[in-house]
Each structure stands twice: as C-alpha cells, then as structure tokens.
C-alpha cells in the first residue's frame, strides 16, 4: 500500500493544532465545522440519517464538477504549485489545516518529507475518485463531500466499502478510527456554487 505511514504520524501536525482551536456557541461551531471539514463527535450524530452514497458524477452541479476537475488536473500533473493556484483562484482559500499554518505546500512537505509533499496529491486523487455525499441540503452549509466515509458510520460499512476505505487508510488506521468512532483521514468539501471549502484531515 502506498500509504504505509501510520495515520497518527501522517496527520500529527494537524491533530496537535486542534488543542488551540477556539470554541464558540454550538450553532456557530456546527456551521463553521460544516464549512471547514470538521468531523462532529460520534455522540453528536447519533440517530442522524445516513446520507446517500453517490457515485454518479452527473449528479454534481456543473460548478462543483468543474472545481473537482480542476483539482484533479493539478493533482494528476504532480505539481503542488499548480494545486496552490487552484486554491488561490477560489473565492476563499480552502481550509487545509486546523492550525495556524499559512502555506499549504510547506505543510504538506513537512508531513510527507520522503516524497517532498507529492504524496498529498496521490491522496487527493484517491479521495476525489471515491463515492461522495450531499449534505446540509438547503442550508448555507450545503456541501458535496468526498469520501463518503466522512458521513457514514464506520460500523455500517460493507466489506466492499471497507476495501475502498483501505485504499486510503491502513488496517491500523481503521482500528484507530473505530476507537474514535468516525473517519478522520483526508476529506474534500465543495459547495454547489463550486467554492472549494476544505481539504483536511483530523477531527
């Protein structure tokens, strides 16, 4: 498997920064979390309806589909600078860390020094090639999120879906996610208007 490094080591800088993350009201946290890619604690989502897993790309709004393709084009080119340009062309720079980092390329190179940061592009491709979900419909936080694991309880995954998960994470990663109660590896969120809101890992 390409992603042999344990999950904790791969996202350690991001997880460390969570200690400093400010806490506002529940409503503010919910809205901000949806836009930033934060994973809600398992207890907060108990009883919530599980969104439909979508694989048909034709169901994406045109602007969402175009943004996804621009991201994939940059990632497949193996060019971090090209991906940065896509981020900068966005309405707002997508959330790429829950910490205070200002330079995504510097962060990715620090997390994946062996590949000089390029491993993040492979992860991004894998994430955007999985099924996705359409969440927070009809609200300002409406979003298309990849991979669907971010909004589907791990205990409900079929064997086939677990194999798909293992393309992104190791068995050890999966065990840690089960202990936490949710998928906490990289995910992408793009709004119906094509705005790319986040590409983050962590909870």
Please give the residue ranges for each predicted region.
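C-terminal-biased regions
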Residues: 31-69, 81-203
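Short basic-aromatic helix/loop recognition motifs at nucleic-acid
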Residues: 72
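Bacterial N-terminal signal peptides
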Residues: 10-20
């Amino acid at each position: 498997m390409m992603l042999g490094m344990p999950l904790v080591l791969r996202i350690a800088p991001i997880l460390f920064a969570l200690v400093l993350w400010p806490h506002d009201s529940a409503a503010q946290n919910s809205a901000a979390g949806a836009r930033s890619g934060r994973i809600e604690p398992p207890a907060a989502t108990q009883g919530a309806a599980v969104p439909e897993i979508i694989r048909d790309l034709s169901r994406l709004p045109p602007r969402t589909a175009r943004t996804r393709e621009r991201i994939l084009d940059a990632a497949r080119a193996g060019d971090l600078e090209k991906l940065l340009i896509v981020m900068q062309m966005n309405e707002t720079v997508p959330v790429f860390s829950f910490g205070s980092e200002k330079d995504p390329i510097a962060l990715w190179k620090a997390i994946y020094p062996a590949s000089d940061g390029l491993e993040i592009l492979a992860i991004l491709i894998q994430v955007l090639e999985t099924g996705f979900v359409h969440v927070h419909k009809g609200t300002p936080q409406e979003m298309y999120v990849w991979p669907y694991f971010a909004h589907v309880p791990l205990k409900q995954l079929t064997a086939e879906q677990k194999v798909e998960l293992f393309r992104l994470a190791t068995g050890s990663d999966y065990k840690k996610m089960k202990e936490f109660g949710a998928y906490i590896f990289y995910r992408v969120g793009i709004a119906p208007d094509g705005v790319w809101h986040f590409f983050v890992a962590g909870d």
